[in-house]
Amino acid sequence: MLADYISRAIQNHTDCNVICDHYQKDELSEVIRRVRKWQFRDGIELMCSEEIETAVQTGNEQCPEQWIVWTVTGDKAKTVSPQHKEFFSLCQQGYWLKMQLA
C-alpha cells in the first residue's frame, strides 16, 4: 500500500534509505523544487517531487499550497497500489495518510 511506504519514507524508517535528495531554488520563478528518492529493503523505490512557491505568504494560511507528487518507480512498482499520488498541501497529504493507515 502506497500510504505505508510514504509514511515510512517521511519518518526515515530503518527499512529505507535515501538514494537521492536534490534541492533547487529558482530565484526568477520564486519556486523551490525538491526531489527525493528512497529504496526500501523489499526493493521498492519511491520518489517524491515537491514544488513550493517562495512568494511572500499572507500569514492567514494554515496550510500553504505545496505541490507534492509521490511515484513508485523501479522494477517492483506494479506491486504497490496506487503507484502515483498527488497532493496540493502537506495538510491534504497528512489527512490522506491518516485515513489510509487507520
Named regions from a protein language model:
Residues M1-A102:
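Cysteine-centric segments in proteins
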